[in-house]
Amino acid sequence: MVTSVRTQPPVIMPGMQTEIKTQATNLAANLSAVRESATATLSGEIKGQQLEDFPALIKQASLDALFKCGKDAEALKEVFTNSNNVAGKKAIMEFAGLFRSALNATSDSPEAKTLLMKVGAEYTAQIIKDGLKEKSAFGPWLPETKKAEAKLENLEKQLLDIIKNNTGGELSKLSTNLVMQEVMPYIASCIEHNFGCTLDPLTRSSLTQLVDKAAAKAVEALDMCHQKLTQEQGTSVGREARHLEMQTLIPLLLRNVFAQIPADKLPDPKIPEPAAGPVPDGGKKAEPTGINININIDSSNHSVDNSKHINNSRSHVDNSQRHIDNSNHDNSRKTIDNSRTFIDNSQRHGESHHSTNSSNVSHSHSRVDSTTHQTETAHSASTGTIDHGIAGKIDVTAHATAEAVTNSSSESKDGKVVTSEKGTTGETTSFDEVDGVTSKSIIGKPLQATVHGVDDNKQQSQTAEIVNVKPLASQLAGVENVKIDTLQSDSTVITGNKAGTTDNDNSQTDKTGPFSGLKFKQNSFLSTVPSVTNMHSIHFNAREAFLGVIRKALEPDASTPFPVRRAFDGLRGEILPNDTIKSAALKAQCSDIDKHPELKAKMETLKEVITHHPQKEKLAEIALQFAREAGLTRQKGETDYVLSNVLDGLIGDGSWRAGPAYESYLNKPGVDRVITTVDGLHMQR
């Protein structure tokens, strides 16, 4: 967008020169009726450069016009600006919008204009007197402001009467005049500013055709609804003000039109003339200096022997000083050349070329002694932690300080590489310095390892088992007791597709059938259990309330793997929907469950999950409470397949079907003394 420097000859916009013989909308017809005087009337008071600014500008102009009628315009602005009464400010803005339109409509009648100014003066006096405080007559109705509101209603009625007397009873002329005298001139000025041109009279008179036809039809439909509503319910300041406010949105309809104009149809922008004076380089402008980024990718092959080795890092470490290659092959991993990892006197050589702009990093090689069950990572004493650019992935051996908690062997075989990667949390592995003299580091966060087999430079994923890494006390010399406890509880290496759990995981075991690794939030359902008093008043909704508790209890924990959590959430939402209509529909569908084998299989799966819930005993107690206090088991399992499966999962012996412990107190002796009150059911004394 280039703004013109000097006045340009008129530009005829394409598609705007032909005379419009048929009008698509009433809005276009209203404008065409005054087309002969279009050139003279298209000179509105509102000036701006952006189409979307028009509604705010017209509101500000309306407030200014109203406040000018008062004795102190600045005081009125201060009262209005500092007020927190939203409803009162909205009422004043509606009155101001209609008042300004009435001033334009009565410009030819001095008497009507005098009456308007009098109404405006009285209205502004009420604003000063009221102060637009919390209890304001301009806001919602209050008994304290009844007299002041009666005065405001009288002023609004006078304003409408003045408009009707000067428009022949046709209030629609206000919107037509607003569009013709304010909206279209504003659109013309925005076009001239944005395109750097001057519109000729014919183009200015055809601005209506720029408005999107579909949007214009919507405006026309709203006009018809407004007229019909006025005929049925009469006129009011608020209704008329909102109708005028709708017309101020017309400029917004042009934003998409401007974006769809082809580039070859736009007028050539005016190029500013060069400033006077000598121009260096023969008048040629110096081109801006660009930034060149050269990326060299080395596609050389890595040679890997078949000796036993474990590389638990994307970065390979050796004893000598080595280089970090700033270019990477997959845009996400940094490689280090000339690396060697020693495990059981076997070594692996990986060589790669690097670019000239690589940086140097010094570290000591990682060594593992399987006989002492210790894992140490020695590094230079100048650094307390490994740089996060290559950290997060460290070298750990297959026999490193690991206690196998499974029955399968976790020994590494020939031609296998164990690669440790960050967990799903995306956190970088941290290293805590143990001894500043020996510069030893220990693993401080959980790591996840994946086994890969190496065969002719090809890697194949292998399954592995769960191992717990617990540092020995000899490794933790000089570390505080708090840090020791944290490391011993958190150091877990997950190397397979089983769900690994820590020692303090509340015994959530992998017994959830197809949802391996599923964990639930602890005690999250307690907030949904109603009190005993409330249970007495939900006898007709006991089923939904109880299933809501079960649905909350089955909410997966954030530590559950995302694919498992997503799959189980889908099953939970289908069988236990959080919608009474869907729940009733599912109950009706389950009335003939034999015709829906897939649904029956899903119910059995959910029942199995409930059976192995770690807090099943607590949920069974809640079910017993619902049965006694809310009459839950009055709805027998024969008539509610979903409820019966949930109760069977919690209470495996089926005692809830006929046991007296699961009967509501309403079905026991003395039920004839139960009375219904406002706050529920009570026993007569």
Swiss-Prot record:
Start-end of Basic and acidic residues biased regions: 315-337
Q: What does this protein do?
A: Actin-binding protein that interferes with host cell actin cytoskeleton. It stimulates actin polymerization and counteracts F-actin destabilizing proteins. Potentiates SipC activity; both are required for an efficient bacterial internalization.
Q: Which family does it belong to?
A: Belongs to the SipA/IpaA family.
- Composition-biased stretches (Polar residues): 369-385
CC per GO annotation? extracellular region
Name used for this protein in its record: Cell invasion protein SipA
* Superkingdom, taxonomy of origin: Bacteria
Q: Where in the cell is it found?
A: Secreted
- Name the Pfam families on file: SipA (PF09052), SipA_2nd (PF22163)
Specify where the region named Actin-binding and polymerization lies, as residue ranges: 497-669
Region Disordered, annotated ranges: 265-386, 402-432
The record's annotation in NCBIfam families points to:
PRK15376.1
Q: Which UniProt keywords apply?
A: Actin-binding, Secreted, Virulence
Q: Where is the composition biased (Low complexity)?
A: 291-304, 417-429
Its predominant location is secreted
MF GO annotations = actin binding
Its taxonomic path starts at: Bacteria, Pseudomonadati, Pseudomonadota, Gammaproteobacteria, Enterobacterales
